[in-house]
């Protein structure tokens, strides 16, 4: 396994040190992928750009979908929808409602995103802070809906 380090070559030689950015890059990558999975199933903006719940049409085992499958292993509903790869909204809407209301997969996904965002921001801080990365995290932030 390759360890990625970035030397600060612009610093005086006596202050030269290396920082390990792998944990930060891993956190950002995981956060972004889970966020993308959630947005694909919930965001009207994603629907405009990529189509409605395209991950279901493509049969993808996204983060909320995997949670929904594991939340009730006796119910094969989500697996059946993934196998059918529906192009029309009817089955997709039903599956999204199931993931939201029955398995609470979107709530779980939001909680994981909140935790990953906090870890990412802490890692940015540990590495000395970075206004540009903090701004990116602000832009990627997903509001957790109020629980009823």
Segments and roles (model prediction):
Residues 1-148:
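All-alpha prenyltransferase/terpene-synthase fold signal
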């Amino acid at each position: 396994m390759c360890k990625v380090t970035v030397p600060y070559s612009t610093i005086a030689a006596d202050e030269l040190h290396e920082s390990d950015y792998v944990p930060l890059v891993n956190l950002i990558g995981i956060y972004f992928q889970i966020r993308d999975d959630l947005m694909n199933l919930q965001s009207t903006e994603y629907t405009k750009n990529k189509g409605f719940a395209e991950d279901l049409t493509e049969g993808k085992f996204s983060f909320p979908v995997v949670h929904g499958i594991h939340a009730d292993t006796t119910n094969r509903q989500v697996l059946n929808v993934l196998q059918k790869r529906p192009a029309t909204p009817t089955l997709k809407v039903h599956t999204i409602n199931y993931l939201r209301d029955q398995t609470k997969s979107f709530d779980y996904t939001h909680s994981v995103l909140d935790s990953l965002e906090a870890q990412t921001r802490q890692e940015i801080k540990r590495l000395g802070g970075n206004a540009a990365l903090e701004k990116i995290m602000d832009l990627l932030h997903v509001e957790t809906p109020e629980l009823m």
